[in-house]
Amino acid sequence: MYKRQLLTKINRDANDIKSTVNFSAKDSMVLSKGNAAHLYGESAIDYQDLKLNSAEIRMNLDSNTVYANGLPDSVGQIEGMPVFKDKSGEYESKTMSYNFKSERGYITGIVTEQQDGYLTGGQAKRMDDGSFFVQDGKYTTCENHDDPHFYFQLTKAKVRPQKDVVTGPGYMVLMG
């Protein structure tokens, strides 16, 4: 006959995330059967020490990934750009994707405060130790970091938050 087995322990998949993911949206949330969620309008995700706010967030819990971007308003200005905050710092960007499990991400249009200045960049890849690699970056101490009067143009850089910035070829740009 058949031997009856009692299930005494649920085997969690190695890909499972370790904590509850809290999420909200001011406008709407669309949840699908495939463990995916689309959040619209002042969206927020809170997971362990990570916080993400953006106008639009797409989340897939099967692959442990999240994608965030701003949305155009009635005159075409992008509003609600992603703001990512964790133990290593706070980052604003145009778009970002992030994996909860590996703690790695890909960011475009990054803006972050480092030491006494601002680092902005075209593309950045965040590593699991909190450091990130930036391509086509700018470092300035000018308060107007969107259109600085002076900056160091960095072809590539590795940033270790609150420690140092190591760059490849770079040059100083002065504007009138």
Where are these regions (language model features)?
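Structural signature for solvent-exposed beta-strand/loop edge elements and short helix-capping sites
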Residues: 3-176
